[in-house]
Each structure stands twice: as structure tokens, then as C-alpha cells.
């Protein structure tokens, strides 16, 4: 006697139940795909190490030791993560509206230089240190906002590609900073390395709660939360997502796309400028060529790995900061150049770019609850 099988026992029924048991694709894809990209990057880099007769196990063990194994290494990783959080936000916010800005490095450099310059006439004037620091922060953020806002204005008013314009503006910013540091604002005492006049000890913000981590980490955390709220819980953020998804539709709905572009670029520039302030007031104590160390470009990797989510930028920045912090240990123990970490970051970046093609294409991730396709 034949018996009819229940719908749930058929392959299609099992597949439907599996789909229903999965979280929504919009929640699971941004987690699984970047993690898979990181794993693939680690495998590719392991092949690279084996080709150099180096042990992948030793390398990743040293990365753990240099970035997470002790309180000292954790502080080192957090200190390097602080500017990455801010520059990651500087890329992530414009990306939410569909803009690809590469100008965080230039905004960071000019922001840090502006903070150092405005502090020069106020040092020794008797003004409270908190007031001077506030002016420095405002100057750095304003300079960064203006500089990256210029790329947004060129895009809106003249149709200039924002990726090209922001990248060119970065090189212009570095050239301007070099001229000012080596020329009118050079400290006569800086013989070997041209720098501005050093900041006084009351204007240094290098220790947070008695640790070696500077206050830039706290600033980055606060901004990440605030910008997450703005981009996900406000009408501005909703309108920005609409414009980022379909610019013509947003314009057809009468949304002020141009003003939103300028606002996102200004916010991004403010974040990068703030990173420049902390580089001056917490790390170097003056503006010099060390401001242009690549944090602005590393922020692109952070934002990509975080899928332009302001909150996700924080843990990703800590991960990349740990990689940077362990570079010296890898160099000493494995006799490899410090640029090895840049190779790994480049592999991660390329893998992330390739992984973007898988969004919406994996059958087991492209269903919402109930079995409807996304």
C-alpha cells in the first residue's frame, strides 16, 4: 500500500523550512560574505607566505600576540584603530548616498595642520586649555568639511566624478601642507624634520583614563553611534539611502539630492579632520610630514569590510589596527618587511571587491522569512 509523503518531507519542503529558519538576507549577507572574504584572504596570504618559505601559523600567531595577547598589545591596537574609525566613517557616510570619496587622507592632513596653526597664537595667551582645544577641534573639522565638501560641490554643480576629484584634492592637500610646514609655519628648531611649533603639554590629549590610548578612540566611538542613528533612524538617513539606491528616483520624488550630497561630504570631511586633530594633539604634538601616513586610504578598507555601517566600522577598525600593531613584531621575528601588512590589507581589499558580486546571488542567502526572494 502506497502512502503519500507529507509536503514537509519532500526536498522542496525541506528547502522551504531551511529558508524559513535562516535570518533575513539583509541581516545575514553583510556578516557571512565579509567573513568568508576574510577567510579567503587568509588562505591566499598563506600561499604567499609559503612561497617565501615562511610559516603561516607563525605569522598569524604573531598577529594575535602583537594585537590581542596582552593589555599592552590591545592598547597599541586601539591607538592605531582610533584614526581608522574616523577615516572609515569618512568613507562610509558618502557611500550611503552613492558617492565614492577618496579624500579622507587630504582632509586629515589639512585638518591636523589647521588645528596646529590656530593653536600657535593662543599658546601662552592665558586662555584655558579647554577653550584652545575646542577651537582646534572646530578648525580641524571645518577644514576637513570644506575640503571634502569641495568634491561634493564639484559633483553636484559641475558633474565632476567625485572619485577622481577627491583623489586629486588629496595630493593637492598634501602639497599645500608640505609648503606651509616647510615655509611660513616651520618651527626654526625643527632642523632635520620640518614641523610646526610643538604644542604645550596642556594641549596634549594622549592618555585616556591613564592608558596609552588617546581620546581619539572615544571621539570615534561617539561619532560612530551618532552617525549610525542619523543614517538609520532619521528622515535624512532614509532619504540618503533612497538617493544612494536610485538617484533618479530620489530626484523624481523631489528630494534635495544636491544638499544631501554636500551634507554627507561635509560630515565625512569633519570626521577626517577630527582624525587629523588627534594625530596632532595626541600623537605627534605638532604638524609635520608624518600626518600623511595612509590612515585616510586605510579607512576605505575599513568601510568596505564594515559594509558602510557606522557601527560595524568600530570592530573592523580594531581588527585592522591590530594588524598594523603587529607589523613590527612580524618584522623582527620572521625577518619580513613591515610592508607585509600592507600586502595582506591589499589582498583583503581585492577579495572584498570580488565578494561584492555575490550579494543577492547565493540561493540560501537570498530569501526572507517565509521563502520570498529578496
Functional labels for PLM-detected ranges:
Residues 146, 209-286, 310-311, 315:
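Helix-loop-helix "hairpin" substructures at the membrane interface of multi-pass membrane proteins
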Residues 33-50, 87-91, 112-118, 140-145, ...:
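Hydrophobic core segments of alpha-helical transmembrane domains in multi-pass membrane transport
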Residues 40-69, 180-181, 228-235:
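Structural signal for alpha-helical transmembrane segments and their membrane-water exit/capping regions
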Residues 162-233, 286, 367, 371-373:
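Transmembrane helix-bundle core of multi-pass membrane transporters
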Amino acid at each position: 500500500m502506497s502512502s503519500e509523503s507529507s509536503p514537509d518531507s519532500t526536498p522542496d519542503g525541506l528547502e522551504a523550512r531551511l529558508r524559513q529558519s535562516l535570518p533575513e538576507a539583509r541581516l545575514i549577507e553583510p556578516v557571512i560574505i565579509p567573513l568568508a572574504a576574510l577567510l579567503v584572504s587568509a588562505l591566499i596570504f598563506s600561499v604567499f607566505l609559503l612561497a617565501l618559505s615562511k610559516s603561516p601559523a607563525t605569522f598569524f600567531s604573531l598577529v594575535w600576540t602583537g594585537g590581542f595577547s596582552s593589555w599592552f598589545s590591545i592598547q597599541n591596537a586601539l591607538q592605531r584603530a582610533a584614526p581608522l574609525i574616523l577615516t572609515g566613517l569618512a568613507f562610509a557616510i558618502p557611500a550611503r548616498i552613492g558617492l565614492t570619496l577618496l579624500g579622507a587622507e587630504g582632509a586629515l592632513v589639512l585638518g591636523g595642520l589647521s588645528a596646529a596653526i590656530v593653536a600657535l597664537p593662543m599658546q601662552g595667551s592665558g586662555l584655558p586649555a579647554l577653550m584652545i582645544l575646542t577651537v582646534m577641534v572646530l578648525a580641524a573639522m571645518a577644514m576637513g568639511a570644506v575640503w571634502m565638501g569641495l568634491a561634493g560641490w564639484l559633483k553636484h554643480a559641475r558633474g565632476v566624478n567625485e572619485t577622481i576629484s577627491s583623489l586629486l584634492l588629496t595630493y593637492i592637500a598634501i602639497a599645500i601642507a608640505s609648503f606651509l610646514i616647510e615655509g611660513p609655519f616651520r618651527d626654526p628648531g625643527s632642523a632635520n624634520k620640518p614641523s610646526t611649533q610643538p604644542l604645550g603639554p596642556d594641549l596634549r590629549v594622549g592618555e585616556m583614563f591613564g592608558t596609552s590610548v588617546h581620546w581619539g578612540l572615544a571621539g570615534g566611538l561617539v561619532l560612530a553611534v551618532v552617525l549610525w542613528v542619523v543614517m538609520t533612524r532619521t528622515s535624512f538617513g532614509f532619504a540618503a539611502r533612497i538617493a544612494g539606491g536610485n538617484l533618479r528616483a530620489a530626484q523624481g520624488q523631489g528630494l534635495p539630492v544636491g544638499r544631501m550630497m554636500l551634507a554627507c561630504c561635509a560630515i565625512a570631511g569633519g570626521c577626517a579632520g577630527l582624525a587629523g586633530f588627534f594625530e596632532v594633539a595626541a600623537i605627534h604634538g605638532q604638524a609635520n610630514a608624518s600626518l600623511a601616513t595612509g590612515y585616510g586610504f586605510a579607512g576605505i578598507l575599513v568601510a568596505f569590510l564594515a559594509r558602510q555601517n557606522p557601527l560595524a566600522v568600530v570592530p573592523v577598525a580594531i581588527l585592522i589596527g591590530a594588524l598594523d600593531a603587529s607589523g613590527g613584531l612580524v618584522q623582527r621575528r620572521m625577518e619580513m618587511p613591515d610592508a607585509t601588512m600592507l600586502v595582506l590589507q591589499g589582498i583583503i581589499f581585492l577579495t572584498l571587491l570580488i565578494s561584492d558580486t555575490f550579494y543577492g546571488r547565493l540561493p540560501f542567502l537570498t530569501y526572507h522569512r517565509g521563502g520570498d526572494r529578496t
